[in-house]
Amino acid sequence: MRVQVSPPALTHSISRGGPNFGVGKHIIIELENCPFRVLDDLHTIEHTLLEVVKVLKVHLLHSYFHKFAPQGVSGCIIIEESHISVHTWPELGYAAIDVFTCGLVDPSSVVEFLKKELCAKRVSSKLLVRGPGEIK
């Protein structure tokens, strides 16, 4: 399959963020003690992750969400600036969310939003600088 990159996507480069920025930022978010009904609801998870796109002011390209039986939801949103993914384990009250953004977008701004929307009692996150070389 041949993929063409649109001109706006070409603005995402190492030089935009400086030498300590890499090509982007990737935040890993662990949400715990969330209600089963929230994490098992496809509509709630999809709506919440699409709201993250708005909060970050990034550009949606594609999204796909899947409801598992007997429980759980996974989804991925492809944004011009990279991606957002989610996997839920309602039986554990746990959701794993990754937000990877290129350019100057700061993905850490969505942590509290996700905690509130998914009714998490506990949240932890780790921000990684992505790019060539060692993980920082």
Describe the residue ranges of each PLM region.
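Polybasic/polar functional segments that serve as interface/processing modules
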Residues: M1-K136
